Amino acid sequence: MQCALYDAGRCRSCQWITQPIPEQLSAKTADLKNLLADFPVEEWCAPVSGPEQGFRNKAKMVVSGSVEKTLLGMLHRDGTPEDLCDCPLYPASFAPVFAALKPFIARAGLTPYNVARKRGELKYILLTESQSDGGMMLRFVLRSDTKLAQLRKALPWLHEQLPQLKVITVNIQPVHMAIMEGETEIYLTEQQALAERFNDVPLWIRPQSFFQTNPAVASQLYATARDWVRQLPVKHMWDLFCGVGGFGLHCATPDMQLTGIEIAPEAIACAKQSAAELGLTRLQFQALDSTQFATAQGEVPELVLVNPPRRGIGKPLCDYLSTMAPRFIIYSSCNAQTMAKDIRELPGYRIERVQLFDMFPHTAHYEVLTLLVKQ
């Protein structure tokens, strides 16, 4: 991938950009095999990759500069701002949005937040695009609601320029810390969720719900999990750390009982909406802590699917699963180091299948799907 920002030394986020994709995949596979070297693996499936540029469905832009000359991008460690509107990881459809947002910020009088001075209002612009219909969700992260009336007043102009903006919100993040969003979300549009579709499964994206940033590879990840589950004798499963329900909604069949658990209420609202659309009445999604939910249960289903954050599922949940011994565990991980650590805490299981998903090209990061079977 060619990147003018990298070539000019202005951005180093894609540290592996000079390596061809096959070399990147080889290095990631070697890393994964090294992490799982202590465990016999029955089958190594071929790694899955997608486009090497234009693949991201989300932009998280730090807003800096001035009202008249706004920069959207990032801050270097020394506080120097860098405009990343030309980042080749973003699809071409993002460019006109960034171009319209800069004059809109001036029209609405949204002073960019100055980290050094702790002054200003507009901290971040968060943009998400649906692959299914091209609709977009735009979130303005503000320090306070002081400029809210001005923003609302200027909004018709933005809608006129960008009719693809289906969901627009203001998020209030009042603290002087590098935190992307606060708890308060104010909707400026009637529509509150962005419609997405992977493999004919309807998914919904709401402002404060996690959603994969590489749709091409994520859809293959979900489809693979579905194919693995269909090969197993499973009538009842848990989907822990389920997010908007991507895994569970793909894996469920009309006669299967499934419980999806996720701590974020916004994500659970999305999952419930999808299940209703699919007419799957035996799916139950609850906004709870996954570990607390699981360890409080006196029995387990045949299959437990886990998709934890980078920290992994942790020892308490590993101990519970070891004791309760579901027949199958499918572990989807964005951090193979913590996954390997967790598998060490599940001594009664063998690894039947492993597959790497290159969700983050040009970096050392990757996702991995692992099927564990009770010995």
UniProtKB/Swiss-Prot annotation:
Leading EC class: transferase
Pfam families documented for this protein: tRNA_U5-meth_tr
Keyword Hydrolase on entry: no
InterPro entries: 23SrRNA_MeTrfase_RlmC (IPR011825), MeTrfase_TrmA_AS (IPR030390), MeTrfase_TrmA_CS (IPR030391), SAM-dependent_MTases_sf (IPR029063), U5_MeTrfase_fam (IPR010280)
EC annotation from Swiss-Prot or TrEMBL: 2.1.1.189
Single GO biological process annotation from the record: rRNA base methylation
Binding annotation for S-adenosyl-L-methionine: Q212, F241, E262, N307
Active site: C334
Keywords: 4Fe-4S, Iron, Iron-sulfur, Metal-binding, Methyltransferase, rRNA processing, S-adenosyl-L-methionine, Transferase
Binding site for [4Fe-4S] cluster: C3, C11, C14, C87
CDD domains tied to this protein: AdoMet_MTases (cd02440)
Top-level taxonomic group: Bacteria
Keyword S-adenosyl-L-methionine: yes
GO molecular function: 4 iron, 4 sulfur cluster binding; iron ion binding; rRNA (uridine-C5-)-methyltransferase activity
Known catalytic reactions: uridine(747) in 23S rRNA + S-adenosyl-L-methionine = 5-methyluridine(747) in 23S rRNA + S-adenosyl-L-homocysteine + H(+)
Family: Belongs to the class I-like SAM-binding methyltransferase superfamily. RNA M5U methyltransferase family. RlmC subfamily.
HAMAP family the record matches: 23SrRNA_methyltr_RlmC
Protein's job: Catalyzes the formation of 5-methyl-uridine at position 747 (m5U747) in 23S rRNA.
Protein name: 23S rRNA (uracil(747)-C(5))-methyltransferase RlmC
